[in-house]
Amino acid sequence: VEWRGKRVRTGIWKEPVAGPVRVGRLNLEGDGQADSRVHGGASKAVYLYPSEHYELWRAELDMPDLGWGGFGENLTTVGLSEEIVRIGDRLRIGTAAFQVTRPRLPCYKLLMRIDRPDIERRFLQTGRTGFYLSVVLEGHIAVGDAIEFEASSEKGPTVAEAVAARSSREE
């Protein structure tokens, strides 16, 4: 894409898909990760974002048409908030298994997508960051698949706690 007079490679524009999608070790089939230095890789193979945040963002940003995938996520889910999910938790979706690795920390590409000068700061301040998953078991996932906790990392921080710790270090 063209942004501020420069050509920028990005995979942040995502669209919902119908039907099953193959989950590989490094990404979902058909997914593009433009900058492997900061996105993707084994510990950031899949980006998950809670659907519950969308209503809040649509109102706050005055973007009523902001649709699923609007934050560059691969999976938009129900019931997996940063307050309950812990770093290290293992999830099963469809025939694939995942492990929660870290919160998503925003970069300028979120600014490209949302086009609000303070979006990176607001994203962190609200704690509505979503989180990355590594792929523990390759398989297939589809819209409507149940999400099950396979194992909980009771000693690990919640994603919200990890975001708060990061934010307090930056202040």
Language-model features and meaning:
Residues G79-S81, G127, L137:
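Short loop/turn positions at the edges of beta-strands in beta-sheet-rich folds
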Residues V1-K109, D118, E154-E171:
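Electropositive, beta-rich accessory/interaction domains or terminal extensions
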Residues D115:
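Catalytic subdomain that performs nucleotidyl-dependent activation
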Residues I147-F149:
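Extended, aromatic/histidine-rich regions of cofactor-dependent oxidoreductases associated
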Residues G88, E138, V143-D145:
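Loop/turn positions that initiate beta-strands
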Residues E138-H140, S153-G156:
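Short Gly/Pro-enriched loop/turn and capping motifs at secondary-structure junctions
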Residues D118-V135, E161-A165:
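A conserved acidic, glycine/proline-rich C-terminal tail/linker
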